[in-house]
C-alpha cells in the first residue's frame, strides 16, 4: 500500500493550515510547519473522516450496550436511553447523540457519568479493519524512515474545532506519549477518539455553542522527541499582552509536566529584535515526566532530585544561547502565521536539536494592557505566586483537591487547589478568583483562566496548606499576590480593573462592526460602567426588580405609607446612572416583573397571594395594570430622567398577551406626562406564545420594538418548568416550535419596521446567536461576560451569510452566461 492509496491517513507533508476540517487544528498546523521548513518531528494524521466512519458505520445493539456497560446500564440516563431505543441495532453516533441530548452539562455528576459511558462504548468497540490496516501500514512506514521496525511515537488528538479563534479548546482532548508498536498505536487512537467525550471537552463545546454532532476528531501520530528539556512559549506576553516580548517556560524531561501544571517551570522573558533576555525566574522544579523505565513505554512522573540529582532542582534549564534560539524560532513561526503563537518545543537528548511539536494561535490575547494595581500597604500579603490572569477577585475560599469536589465551589467563591486541571472548568467559571500551589503562566489552567477572564495566581506552593475553606481572601491576578480578608481599597478598584482586563475592553477599544447590534443585560445600576465598557451597542434589558425590591419593603405598602416620592427618586437615580453610562446608546427599561413569592418574602408582603406556580401567576404587566400605583411610580421616575435630557430610554412591558394591555399602560404613562413614542420608545416582551401568534395585532396598537424573553417563551411553549428536575432535560430554547414563533415574529416585525431583539439567557448562547442572525434579528442582548464572544459569533455568522450570498450570485451569473451560449 503506497501513500497515495490511503483513505484515512494523511502525512504531514500533504497537509496545510487550511486542512483543519480534515485533520483538526493540531494536525493542520504540524503539516503547515513541516512545509515551511520548521523542525517538526515527522508523522501522519488519522483523519477526522476515520472517526466519522467509525461512529457512523459501527452498528451497536441494545444487548451489545448492556454487555459492555454491565450494571451501569441499569441506572441514570443510559437506562432511559435503552428503554426508549429501538430493538434493531443503531449506529454508535445515534447512541452518543441520544445520551448527549439528555444531558444537562451544568450538572457535573450527570455530565461525568454520561460522558464516561460514551468513552467506554468507543473504547470497547472494535476499530473497523479498513482503518486499522491503514494505521498499521503508516506506522510501519514511519518506523522504516529511521531504519527500525518500531519507533516511539506520540499520539495526540486533534479536534476539528480545536483552534478556532473564539474557542480555546487547547488540551481538551488527550495526548499519549512514548507509544510503541502498531497495536498500541491503534489502542491510543481509539482513546483519542473517546477523549472527544470527556466531561471537560463536552462542557466546553456546549458553552461555546458548537454542535456536538458536527465536531470530529483526528489523531496525530508523530515521532517521539526524547526530551532532555522542554516547555512552552508564547510569542506575545499572555499576561501583559505585550507583543514585543516572548515568554518561555522550561523544565526538565517531557513537556507534559509544564502543560499540565504539575511543575512550576523556569520563566524567561525575551525582547523581540534585540533578543535581550529581560527577565529570568529560576523555579524549584520538583518533578519531571520521563519514559516509564519499567515498562519501556508510556510515561511516569519522577522527582528531579532523585532522577537527576538535588542540584538540578534549582538549576537553570536552558542556557542563555538556547533561550535565544527558542525565542528566534518562535518569532519565525509567528511571522509565518501572521499572528502570535502558543508553541510547544523540546530539545532531543539523542541529537541535541530543537524541535517544535505543536503551535496554535493565542486565542486569549487582548488589544489592551492591564493597568498596574498598586500594592496596598495596610493589607497583609499571605501568599505570593505568579500572576496568571489579570484582575482583582475576592471572596470565600473553597479548597478542593480533585474534580469530584467541584460542586462545592459556588458562584463567587475563590477556588483553591493544587493545580487547576481542565476537569475543573465548570467550577472555574463560577469562581471569582483561582489560586493554585503549582503550575506556570503557560499551563493549560492559566490559559483557561485568562480565557474566562477570572483573576488567577498560580505556583504559590502552599495555598492548600495555608488556606482553609471558609477563609476570606483578595486575589491580585496581575501581581500574583493573595491578601488576607477582603481588601476594600482593591475591591473598589475592581470595576476599573475588570473594564481594562475583561474581554469586552478589546471590543470597546476597537469594536467589530456588525450589522446585528450586540447589546447587554443590566440588573443593577452599580455595574453600568462595567457593562458599558464591554462596548455593547446599548442595554437590551434593564431590570427593575433590583432597584425596586432593594428598598427593603413591599413597594405597594411603601407607596401607601406616603413614600412614593422616595421610591420615584431611587428609581430615577438608578435609571439615570445606566442611561448616562450608555448615552446616546439605547437603554430599554423593563417594568417590574417580580413574581408573588418574591414580594411575599418582603416586609409588608404578608397579604401576597399563595400561588402554586408564581411564574404563571400575578406578575408582569398583569400586576402593573391591577396595581397602577406601581406602574405610575415607574413612569414618573422615567419622566424625571427624560427631563434631564436622556432621550435614549425605552419602556418594555413584560408578559404582554393582549393589545388592550399596551393601550392601558400608555394611558397610565400619559397620566404622569410621559408620552410614548415621543419621550420614550415603547416596546413589549415576547414571552407568551399568544403574543407571538397575535404579533400583528400588538404592532397595530403601537410599538417601536419587541424583545424575546426566551426563558419564559420556552417554558410556556413546551409546558416545561425548567426548575423541575424531572422535566428540565426537555427544556430546549432551540426547539422547532420556539424557533417557529421567533421566526414568525421577526418576519412580521420587519414588515412593519418594528425592531426585534432578545434578552433571555439564550442571548448569551453562541449557538442561539448564530440561529438568530440567520433569522434576521436586529439585535441580541447578552450578559456582560458574553458580549465579546457573542459579537465575534455574530460577525462570523454575518461573514458566512455574505459569502453564501456572493457564491449564490456568482453561480446565478455563471448559469445566465451558460444560457446565453
From Swiss-Prot:
Coiled coil: none annotated. The active site is at 444 (tele-phosphohistidine intermediate), 759 (proton donor). It comes from the Archaea. It catalyses: pyruvate + ATP + H2O = phosphoenolpyruvate + AMP + phosphate + 2 H(+). Pathway: Carbohydrate biosynthesis; gluconeogenesis. Its EC number is 2.7.9.2. Its cofactor is Mg(2+). InterPro entries: ATP_grasp_subdomain_1, PEP-util_enz_mobile_dom, PEP_synth, PEP_util_AS, PEP_util_C, PEP_util_CS, Phosphohistidine_dom_sf, PPDK_AMP/ATP-bd. The keyword RNA-binding does not apply. Keywords: ATP-binding, Kinase, Magnesium, Metal-binding, Nucleotide-binding, Transferase. GO terms for biological process: gluconeogenesis. Substrate binds at residues 543, 590, 687, 709-712. The keyword Aminoacyl-tRNA synthetase does not apply. Mg(2+) binds at residues 687, 712. Transmembrane segments: none annotated. SUPFAM superfamilies: Glutathione synthetase ATP-binding domain-like, Phosphoenolpyruvate/pyruvate domain, Phosphohistidine domain. Catalyzes the phosphorylation of pyruvate to phosphoenolpyruvate. The reaction takes place in three steps, mediated by a phosphocarrier histidine residue located on the surface of the central domain. The two first partial reactions are catalyzed at an active site located on the N-terminal domain, and the third partial reaction is catalyzed at an active site located on the C-terminal domain. For catalytic turnover, the central domain swivels from the concave surface of the N-terminal domain to that of the C-terminal domain. The N-terminal domain contains the ATP/Pi binding site, the central domain the pyrophosphate/phosphate carrier histidine, and the C-terminal domain the pyruvate binding site. Belongs to the PEP-utilizing enzyme family. This is Probable phosphoenolpyruvate synthase. It comes from Pyrococcus horikoshii (strain ATCC 700860 / DSM 12428 / JCM 9974 / NBRC 100139 / OT-3).
